Amino acid sequence: MMSNIHTNISEWMKMSEETPVIISSRIRLARNLENHVHPLMFPSEQEGYRVINEVQDALSNLTLNRLDTMDQQSKMKLVAKHLVSPELVKQPASAVMLNDDESVSVMINEEDHIRIQALGTDLSLKDLYQRASKIDDELDKALDISYDEHLGYLTTCPTNIGTGMRASVMLHLPGLSIMKRMNRIAQTINRFGFTIRGIYGEGSQVYGHIYQVSNQLTLGKTEEDIIDNLTEVVNQIINEEKQIRERLDKHNSVETLDRVYRSLGVLQNSRIISMEEASYRLSEVKLGIDLNYILLENFKFNELMVAIQSPFLIDDDDNRTVNEKRADLLREHIK
C-alpha cells in the first residue's frame, strides 16, 4: 500500500499549485513582554509557563501546543514543517500556537517571548504581513509589549530591533547553484541588507538547491520598505534563475538531460538513500520537469521534501533503517 505523504504537510501548502522557483514565503514578527525577563534568562521554567499562559489567554482563537508534553519526534515534525525553529525545541518551557491550516504559528519563549509567523506559497508578503499584524494587534490589546518610541520594538537580538520583522522567501535555485553563482549573489545582496541561508535559517544546511532569502536589519526601516525591497531582490534572483535555466536548455541540454535522468534513475531504483542525496536528486528531477524534459504525474516536490525528512520516517515497529525507508518511499511515489 502506497504511503500517504499528503498527510505530512500543512493544509496551507496543499491549497496552492507548486511553482518553478518559489517554495514559500514568510513574515515573522518578534515581540517581548515588558514584565518578564527574556527567555534565555528565565530564572526558572515557571517563568516560561507564565508567559505561555498570558499569550494563550490573549490568543484564544489559536490552539496551544506545549513542547514539553511532546516526544522528540513530534517536535522535529514541527521543525520540518517550518512551524517552529530548531532553537524553540531546545527551550525547556516553550510552546507554539497554531491556526487550523497551520498558516499562522506563534512561537512562545524562543529567543524572544513571542514570534508570530504567517506562511504562504507565493510572493504575497504584503498579505502575510496583514495576517501577522492582526495577531500582533490582538497581543497588543491584551499584553504590555516592549516598545521604545525612538527605537521601536525591543528584541533580544539587536538586528531585530525596530519593526521586529523578518521577511523571507524560500526559493528553488538549481540553475544558479549548478552554475556556482550563489556565492556571488549572496555577496551582492548582503551589501543591501539581505542574506541567503539554508532552509532552516541562520547556520542551517542547504538541501535540494533550496535557499532562504531574507532581510537582515529592521531598525530605521518601515515594514513596507522591507517588503518592497525584499520583493525586488527576490524577483531579480528569480529572473537570473530563469535565464540560467534557458542557457542550460539551449547550450547544455545534453548534460542537463543526463543530470536529470541520472537523478530520476537513482530515485526510482535506490534501496538506501540519505536525506542530502535525496533532496538534490529530487531538485534535479524537478528541474527536468520545469524544463519539460520529463513528465511525472503527481510529482509533488514540496511534499516529498517534507516526507523524506527523518521525523516522518521513524517508526518503532519497523526494523528498516531511515535511509532504507526513504528510498522505499521515493520508489513508491516517483514512477
From Swiss-Prot:
GO molecular function, one term: creatine kinase activity
Annotated residues for binding of ATP: 24-28, 82, 115, 166-170, 197-202
A Pfam cross-reference name: ATP-gua_Ptrans
GO cellular component: extracellular space
Keyword Transferase: yes
Stored InterPro entries: Arg_Kinase, ATP-guanido_PTrfase, ATP-guanido_PTrfase_AS, ATP-guanido_PTrfase_cat, Gln_synth/guanido_kin_cat_dom
Keyword annotations of the record: ATP-binding, Kinase, Nucleotide-binding, Transferase
Substrates-to-products reaction catalysed: L-arginyl-[protein] + ATP = N(omega)-phospho-L-arginyl-[protein] + ADP + H(+)
Residue ranges of every copy of the Phosphagen kinase C-terminal domain listed in the record: 21-244
SUPFAM superfamilies, per database record: Glutamine synthetase/guanido kinase (SSF55931)
Gene3D superfamilies reported in the protein's UniProt record: Glutamine synthetase/guanido kinase, catalytic domain
Superkingdom of origin: Bacteria
One GO-annotated biological process of the protein: phosphocreatine biosynthetic process
E.C. code: 2.7.14.1
Family listed: Belongs to the ATP:guanido phosphotransferase family.
UniProt-listed PANTHER family: ARGININE KINASE 1-RELATED (PTHR11547:SF38), ARGININE OR CREATINE KINASE (PTHR11547)
Entry-linked NCBIfam families: PRK01059.1-3 (NF002193)
Physiological role: Catalyzes the specific phosphorylation of arginine residues in proteins.
Identification of the protein by name: Protein-arginine kinase
Organism from which the protein derives: Staphylococcus epidermidis (strain ATCC 35984 / DSM 28319 / BCRC 17069 / CCUG 31568 / BM 3577 / RP62A)
Lineage, opening ranks: Bacteria, Bacillati, Bacillota, Bacilli, Bacillales
